[in-house]
Amino acid sequence: MFNLEEELKKLPAKPGVYIMHDKWDNIIYIGKAKVLKNRVRQYFQSNRNKSAKIVQMVSHIQYFEYIITDSELEALVLECNLIKEHRPKYNTMLKDDKSYPFIKITVGEEYPRVLFARKMKHGAGKYFGPYTSAAAVKDTIELLCKLYKVRTCNRNLPKDEGRDRPCLNYHIGQCDAPCQGYVSGEEYRRRIDEVVAFLNGDYKKIMDRLTTQMQEASEKMEYEEAARYRDLLMSVKQVAQKQKITADDVNDRDVIACASDGQDAVVQVFFIRQGKLLGRDHFHMKVAEGDSKSDIISEFMKQYYGGTPFIPNIIMVQYEIEDADTIAQWLSARKSRKVSIVTPKKGDKEKMVELAYKNAQLVLTQDAEKIKREESRTTGAMKEIAGWLGLGTLHRAEAYDISNTNGVESVGSMVVFEDGKPKKNDYRKFRIRTVKGPDDYKSMREVLTRRFTRGMREREGLEDSHGFSRYPDLIMMDGGRGQVNIALDVLKELGLNIPVCGMVKDDTHSTRGLYYNNIEIPIDKHSEGFKLITRVQDEAHRFAITYHRSLRDKAQVSSVLDSIEGIGPVRRKALMKHFLDIEKIRQASVDELMKADGITENVAENIYKFFH
């Protein structure tokens, strides 16, 4: 079971993305943090100063997970991509599906433009980003225009040269008007090269220049101008920060890294699409003696890419693998396009592989703890129950319940738990045949008698096997002394010896304890055994009442339709097959009713008049 306090203590003091799940494993919120430890803990502190939405979201959190990154900027971009992928319920602020902006330089033009772009189109120019602040990108473009006098207009140059007067940017000193021939193509290209160099990270010269201009303006007491340079300098620092979480091209690629503890291995895959990290997944691998991480990755690739429909252009792996060329040829044949397998040795790509490895190591550690928690809530819980009852072993348990409405459509349910987990293939349901009226004791006697008589006949080979021949180590009755005694009587009559306990409830219909060997055994409500008993009890009730309601609804439909002149079993079945439920039949017109098989105009009119 997920222990919130313990997991909060383990949060790292690193940037990353956190992912909140509800009890059905749905992702309900994704966020980013500069320091995961501080940000995630804030959700589980006092509700004071929290919005109603956050309070509600926190109330639905069952567990959380996280992905570590190397910077807050990387976390922001990853958060955006994951939210696009999963669209969590509580991330309402990002419903506009806005993408982070790029700076685009139309390098294919004779006089390239520096533009703001939301989408990246292959072959349409040179892109830088994505960046996290649209305002910073616009400020940076404005800065570049002021420093290098490059254009941002849509004029077709040199075709439109001299056709119109210079635009406003020329008059405010942000463009040297190549549209008028005021700057040569060679000089303009040199300026564009400097812009590209700046956006590639060579921005020290510009920052020094801005700093000098800011100081000079301050010394001249031109404080507004100094503040403007200061703000632009801050924007440059933000825009110029590099992020390895985004690749420098739009090639689709997977990044694969492996972590192993010698017994188990986790392979982490980062999925980079159109140059952006869209998500990640991890896979468990069985480790054979002598397997290296290179062997594990090689085997993973053969199994994974043999079953996935999409193969990226480039696969970046943590270690060089012996059969890389063969695997690459195989994948290239499957994709009908060259696939490269590379092992980065330096730069951002190596750091990206290292980041995948860190997350693989994190998953390996978390999964080891998760396995322990799962064992505690399943096999561990069964051992607790066995200990309370003094049973040697407890592998399989069956639980029974009865459901009816004032004795109408009475049914029984049998649910099975093995090693603390529901085994739904072995569930059985019983329609009560011999009992009239609401008598749960007699109904339970019939269910148990039928179940174990059928089991005995299957064991003797007198009937085909339908799963009844396997007996439980424990029978769990929904109730106390009365229900337990019914079960013991049935077993005694059939000559069977199976332990029986009752799941006793209090006045609020909540589980209180176990009734066994004529005594009620109190149990710790915080124990895993108690929680398992509650799950068993709830599942038996759910399975019984679901079956009962389905029979009751069918009976109500049959009763209503049978009251209509001209409707017999065949036409009733045809109507239900066509309309699916009684309400749609009630709302249908005469023409719509006649579309069902066997429904004539006269019969359709009878049905319509009956409901109207």
UniProtKB/Swiss-Prot annotation:
Keyword flag DNA damage: yes
Major site of localization recorded for this protein: cytoplasm
Superkingdom of the organism of origin: Bacteria
InterPro entries, per database record: GIY-YIG_endonuc, GIY-YIG_endonuc_sf, GIY-YIG_UvrC_Cho, Hlx-hairpin-Hlx_DNA-bd_motif, RuvA_2-like, UVR_dom, UVR_dom_sf, UvrABC_protein_C
Molecular function terms from GO: DNA binding; excinuclease ABC activity
A GO BP annotation: SOS response
Compartments (UniProt record): Cytoplasm
SMART domains, alphabetized: GIYc (SM00465), HhH1 (SM00278)
Residue ranges annotated for the GIY-YIG domain, each copy included: 13-92
Subunit structure: Interacts with UvrB in an incision complex.
Family (UniProt): Belongs to the UvrC family.
Name the UniProt record assigns to this protein: UvrABC system protein C
Organism from which the protein derives: Lachnospira eligens (strain ATCC 27750 / DSM 3376 / VPI C15-48 / C15-B4)
Gene: uvrC
